[in-house]
Design a protein with these regions (language model features):
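Acidic, amphipathic alpha-helical patches
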Residues: 43-47, 69-72
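Catalytic active-site module of serine/aspartate enzymes centered on a nucleophile-bearing elbow/loop
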Residues: 79-111
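Alpha-helical structural signal in soluble globular domains
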Residues: 13-16, 71, 75
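Conserved alpha/beta-hydrolase "acid-adjacent" motif
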Residues: 63-68
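Short, glycine/charged-enriched secondary-structure capping and boundary segments
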Residues: 69-74, 96-99
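Short beta-strand/loop motif that positions the catalytic acidic residue
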Residues: 49-50, 56-58
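Conserved alpha/beta-hydrolase catalytic His-Asp/Glu region
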Residues: 1-46
Length: 111
């Protein structure tokens, strides 16, 4: 899960070229398993202070696991959470039609 396949769009397969060293120093390999300088940064208590409507989207093969997404959903007032089956973090690429329908609907309700 989470590893690009040869059949995936090029934007999901290409290696990152910029910011990798800084990112790894700050977070580690990714923001969901932090082992870098920011590993002790606690954000969960701040989520309740978000006043704007929030749309939380993640995929079942995402490093942002359903537990992480549900934690955000449970903590942010006026939020909505959508879980995309068989998608990684780039749901907008892997399930473009559903993503666009969802985003348009949410924007009509909240913009």
């Amino acid at each position: 899960a989470g590893v690009p396949k040869d059949t995936d769009p090029e934007c999901l397969r290409r290696p990152k070229k910029i910011g990798t060293d800084s990112y790894i120093t700050a977070w580690g390999p990714n923001e969901y398993t932090p082992i870098g300088n920011l590993s002790n940064y606690e954000y969960r208590d701040k989520l309740k202070n978000i006043k704007e409507p929030a749309l939380i989207i993640n995929g079942t093969n995402d490093l942002c696991t359903p537990l992480v997404a549900k934690t955000m959903y449970d903590s942010i007032p006026n939020s909505r959470w959508e879980l995309f089956d068989d998608c990684r973090h780039a749901c907008f690429v892997e399930d473009t039609d559903r993503y666009c329908r969802l985003l348009n609907e949410w924007m009509e309700q909240n913009d």
